[in-house]
A protein has these predicted regions:
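Non-catalytic cap/lid and distal C-terminal segments of serine-dependent acyl enzymes
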Residues: 2-3, 14-316
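Hydrophobic helical h-region of N-terminal Sec-dependent signal peptides
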Residues: 5-11
Length: 316
């Protein structure tokens, strides 16, 4: 039953994907800087907003969702959180690209879509990028924050767990934090096929490969507790709120229905993660579960405003 539910959720991802949204608010911000960094994947574009007070010690990385584009990060396309956080005296870094990557170091290139270069996003985000930011801007490479939506939410917790000196704050907004739950691995497989025809076996191997467990926040929750990582975990209920496009066209109906299903899966994962943290005595976390909300940018942008004081008090 759970597996069937997860697959049912994953199948419509071509309409509204994990990390997808329907409402664009910002698009290109001329006040941000392009910053290209060399890596094993080639040159990677990043967008940088400087803190208004000029400090170099307070830095946050914002991670995209499954359909991350190669021109701009979804956070810039769909929201205004870059300039907002900069106004709160936080330096903002948005890596660009990484479709279906889970921001992980992959085992191999994906053979389904002719991928030429193996993803090595974990290495990039924890080695190439912080070193380059330190050299170019003088940014501090420890006690940073990392926040992501959906796919990026899972990755944010993973990166914080295994790189605690770099990231002492991690936020998951509608993330998938229990990927060993029944049906989740199948759902991820289908979603990645839909978003770029990626073979999930190239990422973490077959379902029995230990790499799946290494990247499951539910499994490595004790690392976050032991590191005393400050966490922010949020999700909606899957119930649409006034203002969600649901009646104007068939596309609106399908998008909102898919967004509802995705958010139901996310909140179930996030609630299970909450139970796990409580069971192991991990309390350095804020949960922000909303009574309404689907898998959409219009809900993630307000979360950044909500968590900004907590982030500001922790990083640097």
């Amino acid at each position: 039953m759970a597996g069937a539910l997860a697959l049912a959720v994953a199948l419509p991802l071509g309409v509204q994907t994990i990390g997808g949204g329907a409402i664009a608010n910002a698009a290109f911000d001329p006040n941000a800087e392009d910053f290209w960094v060399d890596s094993d994947m080639g040159g990677i574009k990043n967008r940088v907003w400087r803190a208004h007070d000029g400090n170099t010690s307070r830095v946050v990385y914002l991670l995209d969702g499954l359909r991350a584009r190669d021109d701009l990060n979804g956070w810039e396309i769909e929201t205004n959180v870059g300039p907002f956080l900069a106004s709160q005296n936080i330096n903002v870094v948005m890596p660009v690209g990484g479709e279906s990557s889970f921001y992980s170091d992959w085992i191999s290139t994906s053979n389904f879509n002719g991928q030429e270069t193996k993803y090595s996003w974990e290495s990039f985000l924890t080695q190439n990028l912080p070193n380059a930011l330190a050299n170019r801007y003088g940014f501090q490479s420890w006690n940073n924050g990392i926040i992501g939506i959906s796919m990026g939410g899972s990755a944010a917790l993973t990166l914080a767990a295994y790189h605690p000196q770099q990231f002492n704050y991690a936020g998951s907004l509608s993330g998938y934090l229990n990927i060993s739950a029944p049906g989740m691995r199948e759902a991820i497989r289908v979603a990645m096929l839909d978003a770029g025809r990626y073979n999930v076996d190239a990422m973490w191997g077959p379902p029995w490969n230990p790499a799946w467990l290494r990247n499951d926040p539910f499994v490595f929750a004790n690392k976050l507790r032991d590191n005393n990582t400050r966490l922010w975990v949020s999700a909606g209920s899957g119930v649409p709120a006034p203002g969600d496009p649901s009646r104007h066209s068939l596309t609106d109906v399908v998008n909102t229905g898919s967004g509802s299903a995705l958010e139901v899966l996310s909140v179930a994962n996030s609630r299970a993660f909450q139970v796990k943290l409580a069971a192991i005595g991990a309390h350095n976390v804020t949960y922000n579960f909303q009574p309404r909300g689907v898998h959409s940018w219009r809900y993630w942008e307000p979360q950044i405003h909500d968590l900004a004081p907590d982030l500001s008090a922790t990083i640097g």
